[in-house]
Amino acid sequence: IGVLFSGGVDSGAVLLAINHELLVRGDSPARLKAFTLSVDGEGEDAKQARDFLRATELEMLGETISVARSRVDPLEAIQVIEDYKPLDVECAAVVLALLQGIRDDYPGWRYLVDGDGGDENLKDYPIEANPELTIRSVVNNRMLYHEGWGVDAIKHSHTYSGGLSRGCVRGYQPARHYGFRIFSPFAVPGVISVSEAIPFAELTCGSHETLYRLKGDVVASGI
């Protein structure tokens, strides 16, 4: 089992949970690897990943996949995911580079897990980056970042799931392209349902900083 690992909250929680479950089952942690991309030997993810693994005493799980900058190809990403939204294309381009590196090193590897959906579930996006948003509009709209992810509601359309389609495709299609099967525990209905029931307004009291801390507090409590 490979975790697409940045050392952040979402992929970190996934790695710790899978490692725990393997130990509970009596399986070897050697079945698990944390794959981190490094482009031209640079990037914050590789350092953050090393720091996380060191702090959790799981350094033996880490593996850095190093690629040349030319390997991160947005045009290839557009062809694979058949989409044009800049953030989704950027995400897919990076994932494709990482997955090609994993496939080159491990021709028989099949299963991958990532933390996609963690930001949406706990509204962990900078409000300041979008002039149309306010703290009130974010915390009072339970499906703001779950465009199409709703469990009991339809946000836009009965036939188009919007953000959910994009979220699935940007992970699923690159994985399929290289012969992997990928899964995110943050993108299943049960978890999304819990996230939509969180009383964000009451917990944050109108504070940006409190909202940004909330994700770490919730995930840390669960872990």
What are these regions (language model features)?
Residues I1-G222:
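ATP-dependent adenylate-handling active sites, centered on carboxylate activation for C-N bond formation
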